[in-house]
Each structure stands twice: as C-alpha cells, then as structure tokens.
C-alpha cells in the first residue's frame, strides 16, 4: 500500500528546473543575448543515474569534479554530458526564452522588472505542457541566487505566473538550491548553454543534440524595431 501511494505521488509531481545565461550588462560590452531555460521532467530520474555514474568515472580518474557546469567543463566532459542527455532526451521538455538585450528598453532592465517579465513569459510556454497542467504538485527549482533583490524578483515572477495558470488544487514548492546539489539544475545549465551559444556565436553543434525536445524557443523582441545601443 505504501509503495502504491509513493508511486502515485511520484507520477503526479512535475519538476521544473530553471537556468539563465548571459549577463546584465546592457551595453555594447555585455553579452548580446540573455537566455532563460526551463527543463521539465518527472521521476524516476534515469538521466540522473547516468550523470552520477559519469561523475564517479571522473572521480576514479583523479578528476576532482564537484558538479557539471557546461561553460567550465572541458570539451571531453561536455560531450559526455550531452551524450547522457541525448540518451534520455525523451524524458525532458525544454523551453527557452531569448532576449536580444539591445532591444530591452531602459525601464525594463532592473532585475525586479526584468525577471518577472521574462520568467512570466517563459513559464506560460512551460505550463502549456499537458503533464504540467495535469500535475497535482509542481516543484520549481532554481540555482541559488546570491542577490536578494534578484531572488525576490524571481520568486515574484514564478508565484504570479503559477497563480494565474495553475488549476485549483494544484500545489507547488519554489526552491533555491546550489546547482551542485541537483543534476536537474546541471541539465538545465547544459541546455541553456547550448541555446545561448547558438544565438551568441551561431554554433549549433550542441544545440542540435537537444533541439528535438526544445518545445519553445521564443525570441521575445523579434519584432522590435528599436535598439537602445
């Protein structure tokens, strides 16, 4: 009986992992784009088992790996992680929002404005997913956000959007965990890196490895005609 109840709880819970890329330097010296990516998945996390095995392979080779971080990992590790993701890609839903920063009007650039606006748009796509709509519980996890103002802005965006879109009776938890604590956050980091690299540098080698499960990739200012710098 306990096992059946646990199985039901697992199947009715949806996890959403969030990551961001680019910087908040809205000038020619900053990144051209800012990206937000959500990776949605359910247990059992078979991909996590594969990544855990890969991590221990590294440790046994004398490599002191704490966690996978795409921008910092060497090319061999990066390819191995993307191979793991590719083998379990069908278990993921990936959604990304792309911001061409030079089209972001000055009044929108402060984190307390920017985060709620952009995360709200991203989560609208995420919540169009049938499993997310039918879930009895959502667990939304972001990387630890060191700046309190930004953390509160992220929480505001998520809570406002979920309050509008979730059916009655659906509960959710919003957690801020260090990325090293959960493979889901590391997967979101890898997927977001691939999307940002495509837009920043035009390189699609890694992007092509995940694009089949990229359900949305919204260039939010694609119709914008005004550039601010």
Describe each model-derived feature in a short phrase.
Residues 1-229:
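Phosphate-ester processing/binding pockets and catalytic centers
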């Amino acid at each position: 009986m306990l096992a059946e109840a646990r199985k039901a709880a697992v199947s009715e819970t949806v996890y959403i992992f969030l990551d961001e890329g680019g910087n908040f330097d809205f000038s020619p010296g900053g990144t051209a784009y800012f990206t937000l990516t959500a990776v949605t998945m359910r247990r059992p996390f078979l991909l996590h088992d594969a990544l855990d095995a890969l991590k221990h392979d590294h440790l046994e080779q004398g490599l002191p790996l704490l966690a996978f971080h795409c921008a910092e990992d060497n090319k061999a590790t990066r390819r191995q992680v993307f191979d793991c993701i590719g083998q379990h890609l069908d278990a993921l839903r990936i959604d990304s929002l792309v911001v061409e920063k030079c089209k972001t009007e000055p009044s929108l650039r402060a984190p307390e404005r920017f985060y709620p606006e952009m995360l709200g748009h991203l989560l609208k796509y995420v919540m169009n997913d049938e499993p997310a709509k039918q879930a009895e519980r959502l667990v939304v996890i972001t990387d630890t956000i060191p700046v309190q103002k930004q953390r509160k802005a992220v929480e505001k965006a998520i809570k406002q959007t979920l309050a509008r879109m979730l059916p009655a009776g659906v509960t959710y938890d919003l957690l801020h965990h260090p990325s090293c604590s959960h493979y889901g956050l590391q997967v979101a980091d890898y997927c977001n890196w691939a999307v940002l690299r495509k837009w920043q540098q035009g390189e699609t080698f890694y992007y092509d490895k995940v694009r089949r499960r990229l359900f949305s990739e919204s260039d939010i200012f694609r119709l914008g005609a005004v550039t601010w710098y």
